[in-house]
Every structure is written in C-alpha cells, then in structure tokens.
C-alpha cells in the first residue's frame, strides 16, 4: 500500500505560517539590512526628481489632486483614449478608430502593442465611461470585502482594517473623470481583486478577475503565469488547466489583435522607441511617488516609505503574502529592465493592492527585531 502523499511545496510553505519568526538571527539581520538598503537606495534614486526632474503627470491620481496635471494629461494618453472610445461608441470599428487617432496625435502604431487591446473601448461603448468608473468602484469594494470579511490568513483584524482603508484610498481614484479611460488602473483594480479573492476551493472569482485584467491589459500576463506556477507547485491540476487554457486563449486573442493592427497600418506610421531602456528601479519608484498618496510627502521621506509595503507582504506569509511579494518584485524588476521613464504608470498594475502591505509592515519589522532580541536574551 502507498503511504500518505507528500505535502506539496505550497502546503509546506503555508504550514510555516508567518515566515519571519522562523528565521535564524543572521537571517533576520540580513532581511533588515536589505530593507534598510532598499530604503536608502530609494531615497538616493529619487534625489534627482526631488531636485525638479519629476516625470510628467499621467496618472488618474494626479488628475484627481491637481488641475494643472489634469490639463496636461488631457492633451496626452487619456485624451487619445477618450477620442477612440467616442468613435467606437458612434459605431466605428475599434482598430480603424485607434490607428486613425494614433496617427492624428503623432503616436506610434508599431509594434502592435502600442495600440491598446479593444476590450475597454468596447466596454465603454456598452455602459459608458461613467459606467466603467462605477464598475471599478464596485470591483475595489469587492477587493476590500475579500480582505476584511473573508479574512486574509495570518493578518489580524486591526491590520485588515488598516489595509482596507489603504485599498479604499487607492480604489477611490475611480472617482476621477479620467479613470474610465485608464487601462492600467482598471487592470490593477482587477488584479487586486484577484489577489484577495483567491481561495483554494473557490478560486473561480479570482480567475474571472484575472481573466478580465488580461483582456484589458496584456501586461497582466505575468500575474497569470505566476498563478499557474503556484497551481503547479500546489498540485492543483484543475486550476492549472484553467489557467493554461486562459493563457492559450489570450495568446490567440493577442495574435488576432496584432493581425488587425498590421492590416490597417500605413507605411508612414511612426514606430515606438522600444522598451529596453534599462532605466532601473527608479522607474517603478517614481510611479509609486506619482500615483499614490506619497506624492503629498517630501520625496526624500516618501521614497523610503514606498519600500515598506514590500516588507509587510514578505512578513505576511501564506499563499497571499508570497504571491504578492513575487508579483510586486517581479513587476518592479520588469519595469526596471524594460520600461522607459515615461512608462512609470505601469506600476498601476500593482495598485491599490501593493499599498495595503503597509498595514502589515509594523508587525513584520517587529518580528525581525524580535528574532534578534530573542537570540541576544538567550546569550545573556
């Protein structure tokens, strides 16, 4: 007879609980040194921006809190998406409208990913831009409900309430009149819902949210790939098959989108500058400072604070904490490698969920110092 099945990698990880109390003294010291290095590095990286070299406002958060920023953006990406949405709502085909508006505005049309996926424009035509904004608010409320009432494992009720307030502050950006046009913001809200709504025996709500994010913004694909890796590590065959099917469907849809763009492209159309800038971690950091409430703080104070949520997620443990840690660090690394400074808004894919990690940071830091103190007391 076969003995009991060995626990999967994910089962062994989740059985560990919160990871920091299990660290040896040197491990706790290493994590604290790394956190301090990240905080100092963030302050150093943002120093040029603090001196006046800040990125041009693009975010809905910027538009919400600054009239000049809103006017600047009205001449850029959001105005372009608004014109495309209006033409689609009037009955014109999406790709014809999008390429025409890109040409008229001096935007590139090659490669095909410079043209946003049509999903959001179709949704705007169906329920209106205001409808999209209200839908984003409902989705943000769903993420908050999943966090508080469904009980995020390993977090106290006090931590969940603070995290919910941070989620509400970020999700409230949907009140901006520009929110309905922002693909990255909508995808970020959907991915936040997918992160918090996941439950091992009821994963389909999170699956639907992730699928919707993927349909809105192709940059959500790494989130789904990471989830697939987690499903495989947890030996969850049905979940893994569903995610693999979703990715296959996404690839087919992306190929159809590329074909539609190629057919309508003209010889004189502009090409993108590319996405191999190797601009470093200052890009996602600049995004966090521009797109969150940290923009109201002095940059040299805000930059180190931008790192704290990562410590909170690392200390949370469980499936949610590990997934969040890998997703956020992976997104930041991808931006550091491929994004141009003007692409700092990609960080919206991590919002508002990333900010919720700030609620978990105090206990995580306390646990690290506790490990150091426990060893010291033992030696005494």
Task: Give the location of each predicted region.
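Transmembrane-helix motifs of polytopic, lipid-linked glycan transferases
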Residues: 122-126, 130-158
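Transmembrane-helix signature of polytopic, membrane-embedded enzymes
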Residues: 148-172, 189
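Hydrophobic alpha-helical membrane-interfacial segments at the cytosolic entry of transmembrane helices
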Residues: 235-257
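Membrane-interface alpha helices of multi-pass inner-membrane proteins
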Residues: 191-197, 203-232, 245-248
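Membrane-interface helix-loop-helix junctions at transmembrane boundaries of multi-pass membrane enzymes
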Residues: 153-158, 236-241, 309-327
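Hydrophobic, aromatic-rich transmembrane alpha-helices
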Residues: 141-147, 298-321
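Short acidic/glycine- and proline-prone juxtamembrane loop motifs at membrane-interface regions
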Residues: 176-184
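TM-lumen/periplasm interface segments of multi-pass membrane proteins
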Residues: 4-133
């Amino acid at each position: 007879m076969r003995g009991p099945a060995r626990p999967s990698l994910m089962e062994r990880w989740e059985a560990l609980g919160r990871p920091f109390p299990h660290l040896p003294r040197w491990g706790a010291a290493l994590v604290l040194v790394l956190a301090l290095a990240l905080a100092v590095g963030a302050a150093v990286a943002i120093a040029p921006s603090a001196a006046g070299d800040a990125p041009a406002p693009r975010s809905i958060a910027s538009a919400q809190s600054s009239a000049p920023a809103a006017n600047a953006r009205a001449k850029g990406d959001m105005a372009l998406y608004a014109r495309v949405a209006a033409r689609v709502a009037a009955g014109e085909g999406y790709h014809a409208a999008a390429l025409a508006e890109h040409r008229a505005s001096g935007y590139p049309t090659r490669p095909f990913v410079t043209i946003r996926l049509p999903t959001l424009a179709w949704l705007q035509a169906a329920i209106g831009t205001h409808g999209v904004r209200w839908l984003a608010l409902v989705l943000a409320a769903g993420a908050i409900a999943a966090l508080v009432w469904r009980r995020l494992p390993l977090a106290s009720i006090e931590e969940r309430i603070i995290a919910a307030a941070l989620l509400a502050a970020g999700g409230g950006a949907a009140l901006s009149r520009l929110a309905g046009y922002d693909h990255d913001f909508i995808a970020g809200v959907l991915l936040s819902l997918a992160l918090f709504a996941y439950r091992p025996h009821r994963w389909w709500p999170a699956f639907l949210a992730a699928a919707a994010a993927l349909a809105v913004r192709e940059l959500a694909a790494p989130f789904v790939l990471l989830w697939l890796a987690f499903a495989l590590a947890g030996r969850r065959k049905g979940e893994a098959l569903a995610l693999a099917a979703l990715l296959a469907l996404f690839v087919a849809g992306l190929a159809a989108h590329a074909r539609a763009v190629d057919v309508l492209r003209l010889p004189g159309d502009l090409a993108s500058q590319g996405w191999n800038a190797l601009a470093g971690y200052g890009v996602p950091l600049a995004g966090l400072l521009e797109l969150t409430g940290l923009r109201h703080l002095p940059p040299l104070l805000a930059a180190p604070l931008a790192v704290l949520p990562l410590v909170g997620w690392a200390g949370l443990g469980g499936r949610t904490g590990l997934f969040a840690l890998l997703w956020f660090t992976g997104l930041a690394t991808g931006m550091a490698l491929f994004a141009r400074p003007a692409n700092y808004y990609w960080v919206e894919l991590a919002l508002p969920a990333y900010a919720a990690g700030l609620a978990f940071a105090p206990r995580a830091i306390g646990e690290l110092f506790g490990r150091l103190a426990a060893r010291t007391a033992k030696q005494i």
